[in-house]
Amino acid sequence: MVAITSLAQSLEHLKRKDYSCLELVETLIARCEAAKSLNALLATDWDGLRRSAKKIDRHGNAGVGLCGIPLCFKANIATGVFPTSAATPALINHLPKIPSRVAERLFSAGALPGASGNMHELSFGITSNNYATGAVRNPWNPDLIPGGSSGGVAAAVASRLMLGGIGTDTGASVRLPAALCGVVGFRPTLGRYPGDRIIPVSPTRDTPGIIAQCVADVVILDRIISGTPERIPPVPLKGLRIGLPTTYFYDDLDADVALAAETTIRLLANKGVTFVEANIPHLDELNKGASFPVALYEFPHALKQYLDDFVKTVSFSDVIKGIRSPDVANIANAQIDGHQISKAEYELARHSFRPRLQATYRNYFKLNRLDAILFPTAPLVARPIGQDSSVIHNGTMLDTFKIYVRNVDPSSNAGLPGLSIPVCLTPDRLPVGMEIDGLADSDQRLLAIGGALEEAIGFRYFAGLPN
């Protein structure tokens, strides 16, 4: 068995032949088998993975590009190896032969299909408590949620079952589970990554995203997926101007999250970061106008189109009838039973509220001369499995989905890049993540800033395997 480190470090070990690709793969397989209770993985092909590793070792190219690195793919992304099911019964045997472009680009660079990650059914939730495939468990505490909807990928990366993973993010689904599991989650600018052959929620908002152990690993994967091979120059902390929009993003935080944010800001300020306290005008109003109307209207249309294109034997009705998770069924059935968003509401959201939200971000960054904004990824840490509809937060019963996505939703609706970085553990040893957002197409600059912040913060923990 070999010591499992980051993706970047593993590539260096493979290049130096400190261990073989097969030795790495056997170690990861053993870890996956030891961590079955997390229910992070939906599908695997260990024999196929071993054959691929042996082939790489014979050719002697391990560590070149991504050669020899097994990755976890969320179960709504076509890999050509594992079923593309979105973890819902009607699609459980749907296995497209052609992979998505995001998977194909990684495979072309030498990455291996390591596993398919369990997820919130049809990506429509943030707990990954899936009544069809079972709840994914948080590797820091198996009684708690890992976040979602890419919860299986986050749990697999956090417990080092896989060296990295690809999820999808409509409004939170990469960054939130990364934060709750203590790893890094990156949502790129909308359109930076190809989104074909992925079971959709909302084409206006959906994008593949990266979950990894550190920012350096995200940079490696981003470079390959986006096709931007140039290196990102390091960014010094001194001189960075980072916005703190305290109203909205810092409202009603869990006490542990508030302390983590305060401590992180103080640490970074002492290292030379200039923080600008300024609120984003009309953010709540614009975000509410752009958020749910777009996602709820587009979901049935987008899913029907996907089924027409790729799964001719399964109808939209088959999928909806087969849904097992009550929270997802309630949302889906509402779109069928006459409570759906009207075309007029959708057009207003997409062509009025959304452009105004985007313009508001641009003006905010320009007026305050900002490099990024910083805020807690989620207002609260991971909570017990089963609180899918409501959760008590600071003494008040709140909608689980809305409180968890509150901070990450606005930039999703604006199509902006966001990077969640773990900053500390609470006294209960639960991770807290903080997110930096940038303007559209500032992805590489944002990753460079994230790398500098990560180094300064110095989070050095990982979850380990369940007992």
From Swiss-Prot:
Its EC number is 3.5.1.-. Pathway: Plant hormone metabolism; auxin biosynthesis. One of its GO terms (molecular function) is hydrolase activity. One of its GO terms (biological process) is auxin biosynthetic process. Keywords: Auxin biosynthesis, Crown gall tumor, Hydrolase, Plasmid. Belongs to the amidase family. This is Indoleacetamide hydrolase. It comes from Rhizobium radiobacter. The lineage of its organism: Bacteria, Pseudomonadati, Pseudomonadota, Alphaproteobacteria, Hyphomicrobiales. The gene is tms2.
